[in-house]
């Protein structure tokens, strides 16, 4: 009847619409499911989904599903979730095998010979560049870089000029953050949208939004607690990001 994606971090697919010893499979955040019938009075919905190449059928709670975003946004978010899973759901530390090698893959994708054992080199921008490259072709216009400031500045300049780009930069009150957007924080020295418009050399951090809820969004980023991890960002009553915890801009996903 409809295509949905898993909203929760993980979701148990059950053989019957009850919470019992009946788990068919556990599927991760963003996983695609097809609903097969209307939601019942208890909130269960019958679905099928592909799990490791095999179609599984069962029941899940409908409120743990969400409507799909664009294909390009789903690819970007899926890349972020895949890295979170690869980093043992946020438990794998950057300097420990095999995780330091995964960080190395991100660095090499932007032409830099480092890995997670180079702990004085923040790799969060390499993470964003890595998942954007993996979500191509729609992100080929992304400013791949080892520093967030480079692509933040680029997104603001492109928006101001009205130029086509996968991301446009906005002030917090100008755009209600959505799935696949990037939340921007300054580090060490306070930054503003207007400052980022004239400079691409400042300390910063970005995470990709993978969940939108009432009053907050959750986003995944690299080098969050020395792993791939979640952050929660608060929204105001109008649905805009609050200017707290160093948040100063949002990059809208245009694709």
What are these regions (language model features)?
Residues 20, 26, 40, 70-73, ...:
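Solvent-exposed, acidic/flexible segments
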Residues 29, 79, 178-180:
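Short, flexible surface segments
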Residues 140-226:
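...with weaker cross-activation on analogous glycine-rich loops/strands in unrelated enzymes
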Residues 5, 9-15, 21, 38, ...:
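Aromatic- and glycine-rich peptidoglycan recognition patches
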Residues 66-142:
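N-terminal capping segments
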Residues 11, 58, 168-170:
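Conserved positions within tandem-repeat grammars
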Residues 1-8, 125-161:
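Short beta-strand/loop turn elements enriched in aromatics
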Residues 25-62:
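SH3/SH3-like beta-barrel superfamily modules
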């Amino acid at each position: 009847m409809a295509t949905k994606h898993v909203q929760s971090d993980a979701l148990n697919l059950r053989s019957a619409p009850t919470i019992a010893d009946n788990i068919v499979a556990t599927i991760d955040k963003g996983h695609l499911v097809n609903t097969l019938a209307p939601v019942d009075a208890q909130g269960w919905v019958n679905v099928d989904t592909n799990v490791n190449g095999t179609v599984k059928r069962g029941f899940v709670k409908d409120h743990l599903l969400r409507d799909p975003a664009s294909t390009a946004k789903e690819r970007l978010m899926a890349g972020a979730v895949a890295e979170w899973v690869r980093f043992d759901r946020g438990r794998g530390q950057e300097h420990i095998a095999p995780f330091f090698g995964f960080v190395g893959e991100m660095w090499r994708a932007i032409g830099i010979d480092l890995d997670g054992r180079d702990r004085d080199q923040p790799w969060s921008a390499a993470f964003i560049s890595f998942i954007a490259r993996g979500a191509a072709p729609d992100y080929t216009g992304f400013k791949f870089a080892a520093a967030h400031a480079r692509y933040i500045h680029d997104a603001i300049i492109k928006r101001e000029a009205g130029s086509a780009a996968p991301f446009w930069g906005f002030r917090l009150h100008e755009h209600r953050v959505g799935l696949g957007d990037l939340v921007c924080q300054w580090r060490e020295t306070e930054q503003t949208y207007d400052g980022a418009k004239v400079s691409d050399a400042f300390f910063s951090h970005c995470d990709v939004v993978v969940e939108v809820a009432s009053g907050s969004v959750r986003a995944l980023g690299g080098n969050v607690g020395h792993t791939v991890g979640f952050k929660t960002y608060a929204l105001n009553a109008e649905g805009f990001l609050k200017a707290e915890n160093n948040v100063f801009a949002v990059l809208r996903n245009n694709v």
